[in-house]
Amino acid sequence: MGDIKNFLYAWCGKRKMTPAYEIRAVGNKNRQKFMCEVRVEGFNYAGMGNSTNKKDAQSNAARDFVNYLVRINEVKSEEVPAVGIVPPPPILSDTSDSTASAAEGLPAPMGGPLPPHLALKAEENNSGVESSGYGSPGPTWDRGANLKDYYSRKEEQEVQATLESEEVDLNAGLHGNWTLENAKARLNQYFQKEKIQGEYKYTQVGPDHNRSFIAEMTIYIKQLGRRIFAREHGSNKKLAAQSCALSLVRQLYHLGVIEAYSGLTKKKEGERVEPYKVFLSPDLELQLQNVVQELDLEIVPPPVDPSMPVILNIGKLAHFEPSQRQNAVGVVPWSPPQSNWNPWTSSNIDEGPLAYASTEQISMDLKNELTYQMEQDHNLQSVLQERELLPVKKFEAEILEAISSNSVVIIRGATGCGKTTQVPQYILDDFIQNDRAAECNIVVTQPRRISAVAVAERVAYERGEEPGKSCGYSVRFESILPRPHASIMFCTVGVLLRKLEAGIRGISHVIVDEIHERDINTDFLLVVLRDVVLAYPEVRIVLMSATIDTTMFCEYFFNCPIIEVYGRTFPVQEYFLEDCIQMTQFIPPPKDKKKKDKEDDGGEDDDANCNLICGDEYGPETKLSMSQLNEKETPFELIEALLKYIETLNVPGAVLVFLPGWNLIYTMQKHLENNSHFGSHRYQILPLHSQIPREEQRKVFDPVPDGVTKVILSTNIAETSITINDVVYVIDSCKQKVKLFTAHNNMTNYATVWASKTNLEQRKGRAGRVRPGFCFHLCSRARFDRLETHMTPEMFRTPLHEIALSIKLLRLGGIGQFLAKAIEPPPLDAIIEAEHTLRELDALDANDELTPLGRILAKLPIEPRFGKMMIMGCIFYVGDAVCTISAATCFPEPFISEGKRLGYIHRNFAGNRFSDHVALLSVFQAWDDARMSGEEAEIRFCEQKRLNMATLRMTWEAKVQLKEILINSGFPEDCLLTQVFTNTGPDNNLDVVISLLAFGVYPNVCYHKEKRKILTTEGRNALIHKSSVNCPFSSQDMKYPSPFFVFGEKIRTRAISAKGMTLVTPLQLLLFASKKVQSDGQIVFIDDWIRLQISHEAAACITIRAAMEALVVEVSKQPNIISQLDPVNEHMLNTIRQISRPSAAGINLMIGSVRYGDGPRPPKMARYDNGSGYRRGYGGGGYGGGGYGGGYGSGGFGGGFGSGGGFGGGFNSGGGGFGSGGGGFGSGGGGFGGGGGGFSGGGGGGFGGGRGGGGGGFGGSGGFGNGGGGYGVGGGGYGGGGGGGYGGGSGGYGGGGYGGGEGYSISPNSYRGNYGGGGGGYRGGSQGGYRNNFGGDYRGSSGDYRGSGGGYRGSGGFQRRGYGGGYFGQGRGGGGGGGY
């Protein structure tokens, strides 16, 4: 293959160009690959190779680029050196000319002339998509018109600022100093001048006790010829309108229509915080000053005049070198399927028959296989007959014809017509039958995990296969990938976006399902695909949607054709609230709550109670009952009455109840189960929510026996994503839960809002799958008429930081320019906010390109600030804990609580730390311990402690995924090892975790006043959230050791409350949770509102924060330097550890602490498992209990090595348990197995105690502690130099001992060493052995050790990456059963 590189070099040489190769290592140490990209100037395409060695990677990249040159007719295919045949360019239409001009890339409209923006585009684009693959930057459809003006003006201003050598305070002038106070007046002035009638449109959200408002407005700007839009949220109408005006004014400012605010900004004086006296020991102050000197930092002297305070923060000490500004608008590279490329792993196929097979050969084999299967498999024939009956079948020929002739096609079909499962199969089977199987690979996106998995399993069943052959799926934490050619992969949109970094290579068709849902990822993907279609007209995009108005999508994709698929025609009769009351003769129960006085909502409530509007055709009783129901509440009693009414109809069928959010589902489930009628065997009540485990989710599809009614309580997940065939009745609350975010005050609100008419139409369609159905809408007809037609796109109500990072990672050009091309572009102020946040985090450099830190953050599926916190956690060797806390923030709390406040059983998890985050960490640690004893123990633990097991399992998955990404980015594994934390006594590692948390959640800082009352930024009032461990019971007052807290998010209800709170010391705030620190010599001011009484010199040592940030810069460039930091940096880190201790600020956590109920925690033994189930030394996971081949001893999970009982009693049958007796893992005299004994024999010290000692070994004569030295001491290795191995005799675990004569280098936190001793392997004989770091992948060179039947849900290999056994495999123990 080498001559392909020479061919490309020669071709470029003739044109006076040189190919530029860029190569980097990817994957983990055990299966390292090399990714190579080759670019040639003037071509907007990167050839890619991903192989096991550098040479092949370069050759494959060169071949990919040459194939691209063939496709765009720059090179003739017969000139290309052989080996792997280049597929001919796919034929677009009947024309023989395969040169695709841009005009052909824009499919012809379905009738009538081209609309003006497209006619202009076609003219501009005639030179279009040639060598560059994209055309000039000019001809992008100017949806976000005039954004270019903003960016070009911004560049001029940057140049001017540089000339004046003026340090600009970016934040103050970020939006022209326009604030909530001054924006509305300026907007009104603008309206008067331009003679605009500006009216706010208000929507009320939430129930009465928690009411808030959304204000929105669209205005047309004459001088720019475009509209701008704002939609903001506030606790009353006045605030919502002010926020909406602020967004509009900021956008007008950025577009150059209005000036910056030049008056004095009047800040509302918040409540003053009294100066807090900080006690700092002289020793620590001296240590601080020494570090500052060592780091060569300058301390600002105190001011001469106290009324002129000085700023103590110093600027950044280290910057990333600015990379070259990317001027070309990027596009994600695409190439058709090729012979030796696997699109699902984005790598070349280097070995096996497929590495050298031609596309013709592959196509022939697959056709023969399908033909044989059709003839022989009788089940398949009956499934085919079922498929024939689906409504979409009649449209098969029309769909295939449209897809063949157009780059983009929209298929619109009623729910249940079969489009999701059938369209991909029609395309695939068409290619296979026409001898083009190797030219077809289809990716299908779904908005949710449950639908991606359920649809993939259904399609595999219809093809007579298991997932993993022609059909597979990939969702976060779980994948079964299909074969590399002629296959369909179902995935979530998020997973596809992560795969885009390697391009859409080897994929012939991209199908985007449920486009009407308008989540932020789908909207982002549509912009990417639109650009891809312009650059590569041969790609095929199919957009699928429910029966809604698709005009907007059709125009966005150049007036592409729409195919209408009609569904099964079982009618669905719909009823509204007044009908439901009349039918059931429902009388609402008397209200037991006294109504609170209405707070001032800032104006008239125009969102009238529609329950007072009832037509004359209904009786007076109905009108009265209806008027007594509160529109904002979900009437459980009426749902109950409807279920009883359904019983009387004697029409069997499942009932699907749509409810907004998990809380209502859980409450409704308990409400029904506690009712003697619905809790009986005649009913099966099933919840359906994205957060419940897959096994639970699957139950909703299972049929129930005769005489049993299945009632499914679901969120909008069942609206479009999945189809439950036996549903006949739908009861619809007509509501859904949305997350609203307001940027200017960093406020989150989870509001229950009315669903849109489109949503209600979808929900209605779920009934009537098998027979005529019934839909009961729990809203009045009057309310229905007032509903919005569509929901607001998520892009308008969520921060854009993560999407902005993805844009830069995929090299798609400027963030603003890219988002301006969205189907509905987000407001400009939100884009600028995101760019600014990323610059502050050092994720973007001076040219707005990704820094090495930004590149790591872009790969982590988590909020960028948390990502940086995780990197800092790795530097301090507490990476695992920080990853756990970050993962836990992605999910609801695991506590199952009846009331709003947590009970003692949950508060206990916080120990003495006054911290919700520590409670989460402790819960996770305790659950992780419990599950080591098997699944039954895990279930028992969760029931006893009232914890949601599903949430804990998903947190584990997310944590492991985050750690894997960091390890693959080059971070040493030993900085991510699991540690044991104590929440009841001193623990410096936990102190450091809390310091880093203060950085991660900044600017969310608050000060406790009394009872639940706290002050947040700028002294504004708020409350401790009732779900916090810090929330006092009833009205009792609480005294905390420190009044300062950091918190996860501000939730706006009637009041503003802080959720997820952790107590911090003032020194932790000073160091990690501050932006502006000033001193007048006596008092230090943090961010203009917190005042500390601390010496100027001590406070000035805040400057070491800059040194810490500089270290993050260096570590991001080269993560492996963490394990060999220079003494100055080590000294700085140790000083930060000291500052993080509560005692450093004179705070005693034991004071004021109330310990509830359970008494002190028993001592724990150390764990070094990398979170992967390889725990408690050697017995817990992997090969100690059930794992590989059933483990060593008999016994169950932890029965392992000895014959003894379970976890505590095991390992050495008699005598103490695992860490009982004289001490645990690394403590004093005792060894691993307690007392004086070794693991299962006599002898001296054990694992970490003493020096290894004599004869007693793991399984007999030689072994673990044998030979010269012990664990890390002196000459001997892990198992000493002796002959015995793990299982005695010569063969044993590692032949010549665990690490041969290597020794075991031990630095404070590192356990690195080579585990692959001499001759013996795991089962003797093989030459491999455990050759890797202590908590990583355990794979010997010659064989891997997966339990034969085990594996994560049966798939083999821990988390499908071969981490020691499985994760609750089939047998939890015994031979071949799996285990951890």
Swiss-Prot record:
Disruption phenotype: Mice are viable but have behavioral and neurological abnormalities. They exhibit hypoactivity in novel environments, tremor, and sensorineural hearing loss.
Residue ranges of the region described as RGG: 1152-1380
Motif interval(s): Nuclear localization signal (NLS2): 1156-1174
Chain positions found as Omega-N-methylarginine: 1176
Residues in DRBM domain copies: 3-71, 182-254
Chain spans, region Interaction with BRCA1: 232-327
Keywords associated with the record: Acetylation, Activator, ATP-binding, Biological rhythms, Cytoplasm, Cytoskeleton, DNA-binding, Helicase, Hydrolase, Immunity, Inflammatory response, Innate immunity, Isopeptide bond, Manganese, Metal-binding, Methylation, mRNA processing, mRNA splicing, mRNA transport, Nucleotide-binding, Nucleus, Phosphoprotein, Repeat, RNA-binding, RNA-mediated gene silencing, Transcription, Transcription regulation, Transcription termination, Translation regulation, Transport, Ubl conjugation
Region named NTD region: 1151-1366
Residue positions where Asymmetric dimethylarginine is found in the record: 1167, 1312, 1323, 1339, 1346, 1353, 1361, 1372
Name of a matching Pfam family: HA2_C
Source organism, top-level taxon: Eukaryota
siRNA-binding: annotated segments: 5-9, 53-55, 184-188, 236-238
Biased composition range(s): Polar residues: 125-134
PTM section of the record: Methylated. PRMT1-mediated methylation of undefined Arg residues in the nuclear transport domain (NTD) is required for nuclear import of DHX9.
Residues the record lists as N6-acetyllysine modifications: 148, 193, 201, 1026
Modified residues (Phosphoserine): 127, 136, 323, 451, 508
Domain Helicase C-terminal: residue ranges: 638-811
Sequence positions that bind ATP: 413-421
Protein name per UniProt: ATP-dependent RNA helicase A
